[in-house]
UniProtKB/Swiss-Prot annotation:
The gene is EMB1006. Keywords: Chloroplast, Plastid, Repeat, Transit peptide. It comes from the Eukaryota. GO terms for cellular component: chloroplast. Belongs to the PPR family. P subfamily. Residues 70-97, 700-723 are annotated as: Disordered. Transmembrane segments: none annotated. PROSITE patterns: PPR. This is Pentatricopeptide repeat-containing protein At5g50280, chloroplastic. It is found in: Plastid, Chloroplast. Its main location: plastid. Residues 81-97 have a biased composition (Acidic residues). PANTHER family: OS03G0856100 PROTEIN, OS12G0638900 PROTEIN.
Length: 723
């Protein structure tokens, strides 16, 4: 039996579900206020609308009765306590409105929800705190370590709900697996199952699907499912479909998921939310985000109600599709209005969405309200928050979140330590990173490649410590860890900063020999090494290699190239790099022109500087203090004080004044030149006035002594007059 003749012939998924509605979200700008920061918190990267009459993007805060499926508590005592809390909250929040807090406070707890825990204040994140800390030797509650990301935990939860990991004990399933392993080239599994009609049950079919999927025989799973559907009675079950959707999603076979979904039996048992959760998860894993959204919309049309797993998967899907945190929040509100219960995975996805956009304060609000509703944060949520603050270079907040997590009895994972080590590597504190690595091992956590990469980076960022970075690299290889592209990039950068461009290039060649593909960051580090050494030949060679390998450079890459060529007087090559900027869709920045000006000034090409300033104006680039300072020093160097004073005046008018120390030095030079210029001008003016009024003394010419050559005091050459 071939696939062409099977019932899995290509059909349109949309023939069964007329889905035409797409994601449409309102555009208005969203402002939040955080209880931790008394200032407006933006949920959008765009500027706020000037119109004050724009509609609110938030839905109603559910002042009306909840849906029928959710029972409201009838205890009058609880209601009175809630009303008192609401009155206190209203008194505290009269001066501002926080839509997130208002949403959470408006939600009525269901009878199945746990009571709110005691109010816990956030850890105090003080400024100017010490950067050193000590980890407690043990924890209150040794929980199971969770290393996965939020979306991975949702995927695992969905699989456990579907029963994918439930152990089986069946010899029939193993026989089917052996048949799948021993299929010949033109055979299908369905052709080999002629003797299994009365031997296998629907539970054993699910077991066979799981075993074949784990062994990589996904196509055989499709033929086996077709065979199951053709049996009388049919062996196809919602559980089998769920397992198959999960396996197809792993292999990114989204078309088969849609095909199977459109041909589901018209039975009530197949209208199972777990089945549709698996389909949405599989489509999301295949990066078919629009199709995943349409499946979710189809659920409502066939009266399949979403649950908390649906909500968690959908939040992760929207985030991966590039939707903003504002849009994700709207979906969460709508699903909450439908009576979907909240879970740890739902809030973990929300926190991740907000952190990815840099909305850390809003993510903290969500995390705090989550715990007040009885949903405890896990290690993954804290790792997400710590990583967001680390990327913003707020190491004190990272420390505070780590201490708060530890105080709550949560066990740090290897990912937690990697975030901490990366934070201290940014601060160029390798000693603390070494301490973290030892404490990590003492707690039984095995350092991974990222852990050692943070250590290499910490040494590499510190000048003259490339030998320690190389030692950390060798330690990583000694424990059996294979270096990654990031590891080699950190090592190359360490050599580059220390001036060892030969070692940097040797590491680059070793990386290529080991079959590790260099990233754009790796190429940029190698280019930086030769830029520092002034080797324009190697600079050009690496650049051409990048173009051959079709590696798209970043703005940092092009700025490195430009600076390397321009400082060596290769202005034509530097201009070619600027041209490549435009081809890649990258407009030159102020830093780009600052580098060009510095190179032209050092090369004695000060006449080119006003032209570069005009080019900046044509590109709507506003010169900064570095631009003006470069031009002023260039003209002072060639004693063109008139232009130096002119651009100093422009700098002051534009408000682009450098830092106090640099400006004090610049002012001292200009004032000294001004005094010298004033003295010369004063002497010249006095000379002109005296000449006009005839006050200039005439020079008297003395009478020439005709015997001057016979004066005794005149020096004569030795030996000229000899007796």
């Amino acid at each position: 039996m071939s696939m062409a003749s099977s019932s899995l012939a290509t059909q349109s998924f949309f023939s069964s579900f007329p889905l035409s509605h797409r994601l449409h979200f309102p555009v208005p700008y969203l402002l939040l206020r955080s209880s931790f920061f008394r200032k407006p918190l933006s949920l959008s990267a765009t500027s706020p609308s000037s119109s004050s009459s724009s509609p609110s993007i938030f839905l109603s805060c559910f002042d009306d009765a909840l849906p029928d499926k959710i029972q409201q508590p009838e205890n009058s005592t609880i209601n009175s306590e809630e009303s008192e809390c609401e009155e206190e909250d209203d008194e505290e929040g009269d001066d501002f409105t926080d839509p997130i807090l208002k949403f959470f406070k408006s939600r009525t707890l269901t009878s199945e929800s746990t009571a709110d825990p005691a109010r816990e204040s956030k850890f105090s994140l003080q400024k100017n705190r010490r950067t050193s800390w000590h980890l407690a030797p043990d924890f209150a509650d040794p929980e199971t370590e969770i290393e996965s990301k939020p979306e991975e935990s949702v995927f695992v939860t969905n699989q456990q709900t579907l029963g994918v990991h439930i152990p089986f004990e069946s010899g029939v399933a193993r026989e089917i697996l052996e048949l799948a392993k021993n299929l010949k080239e033109n055979q299908t599994l369905g052709e080999m199952l002629s003797g299994f009609e009365r031997r296998v049950s629907d539970t054993e079919c699910v077991e066979a699907l799981v075993m074949m999927g784990e062994s990589g025989f996904v196509k055989s799973c499709l033929y086996f499912y077709e065979w199951m559907s053709l049996q009388e009675p049919s062996l196809a079950s919602p559980r089998a479909c769920s397992v198959l959707f999960t396996l197809l999603g792993r292999e990114r076979m989204a078309d088969y998921i849609l095909l199977l979904l459109s041909n589901l039996p018209d039975k009530e048992e197949f209208r199972d939310v777990r089945l549709y959760n698996a389909a949405i998860s599989g489509l999301s894993a295949s990066q078919r985000y629009d199709d995943a959204w349409e499946v979710y919309e189809a659920m409502d049309k066939i009266n399949v109600y979403p649950d908390n797993v649906t909500c968690a998967i959908l939040i992760t899907t929207l985030r991966k599709a590039g939707r903003s945190a504002k849009e994700v929040w709207e979906i969460f509100e709508k699903m909450s209005e439908k009576g979907v219960k909240w879970s740890q995975d739902v809030f973990g996805g929300l926190v991740k969405s907000f952190c990815d956009e840099g909305l850390k304060e809003e993510a903290l609000v969500i995390q705090t309200e989550m715990e007040k509703k009885g949903i405890r944060s896990n290690t993954i949520v804290y790792n997400t928050l710590m990583d967001a603050y680390n990327k913003s270079n707020h190491i004190e907040e990272v420390e505070g979140l780590f201490t708060e997590m530890r105080d709550k009895g949560l066990k740090p994972s290897a990912a937690t330590y990697n975030i901490l080590m990366d934070a201290y590597a940014r601060r160029m504190q390798p000693d603390i990173v070494e301490t973290l690595l030892r404490e990590m091992e003492d707690l039984g956590l095995e350092p991974n490649v990222k852990s050692y990469t943070c250590l290499i980076s910490a040494y590499g960022r510190t000048k003259k410590m490339s030998d320690m970075a190389a030692d950390a690299f060798l330690r990583m290889k000694k424990v059996g860890l294979k270096p990654s592209s990031h590891s080699y990039t950190a090592l190359i950068h360490a050599y580059s900063v220390s001036g060892w461009h030969e070692k940097a290039y040797a590491s680059f060649e070793e990386m290529c020999k080991e079959g590790i593909k260099p990233s754009v960051e790796t190429y940029t580090s190698v280019l930086d090494a030769f830029r520092r050494s002034g080797d324009t030949g190697k600079l050009m060679e690496i650049w051409k290699l990048m173009l051959r390998e079709k590696i798209k450079g970043t703005r940092i890459t092009y700025n490195t190239l430009l600076d390397g060529f321009a400082k060596q007087g290769l202005y034509i090559e530097a201009r070619d790099v600027v041209s490549e900027f435009s081809k890649m869709g990258l407009q030159p920045s102020v830093m780009t022109y600052n580098m060009l000006m510095n190179a032209y000034a050092r090369g004695g090409q000060d006449a080119k500087l006003p032209q570069l300033l005009k080019e900046m104006a044509a590109l709507n680039l506003k010169p900064d203090s570095i631009t003006y300072s470069t031009m002023i020093y260039a003209f002072v160097r060639v004693r063109d004080f008139k232009r130096a004073f002119f651009y100093h005046k422009m700098m002051v008018k534009s408000g682009q004044v450098p830092d106090p120390r640099s400006y004090e030095k610049l002012r001292a030079i200009l004032e000294d030149k001004a005094k010298t210029k004033n003295r010369k001008d004063k002497t010249a003016i006095l000379g002109i006035i005296n000449s006009k009024f005839g006050r200039v003394k005439a020079k008297t010419k003395g009478k020439k002594d005709e015997f001057w050559k016979y004066k005794t005091n005149r020096t004569t050459s030795p030996g000229r007059h000899r007796s």
